[in-house]
């Protein structure tokens, strides 16, 4: 099922991302720079390992994981988190845990777009990507 996510995706819209980053605890300057970035996501699958590369003027990051297995991640805003990604009703659902806090990033496919819903403490950001 992860095969449907494989490809290159370009951010086309972002809603409420600054409020979400603020809730996560991202500082003002980092929020402003990150909020202006238009990342490209490159998702690949190799032998059951999913890799998500994010490339932007803000920062380039890469995570690789197997579904259902916890892994260490350093986020673009330099948080050290424990992440786990599961497939839930066709969506890739990532949970990041750090310092007693938790956020969920849900990636789902809708109408040839990939929609990211980032949620923390009731604050939701929606970011929409189209195939590049």
From Swiss-Prot:
A fatty acid binds at residues 127-129. GO terms for molecular function: fatty acid binding; long-chain fatty acid binding; long-chain fatty acid transmembrane transporter activity. The modification Phosphoserine is found at residue 13. It holds the Pfam family Lipocalin. A motif (Nuclear localization signal) lies at residues 22-32. Forms a beta-barrel structure that accommodates the hydrophobic ligand in its interior. Belongs to the calycin superfamily. Fatty-acid binding protein (FABP) family. This is Fatty acid-binding protein, adipocyte. The lineage of its organism: Eukaryota, Metazoa, Chordata, Craniata, Vertebrata. The gene is FABP4.
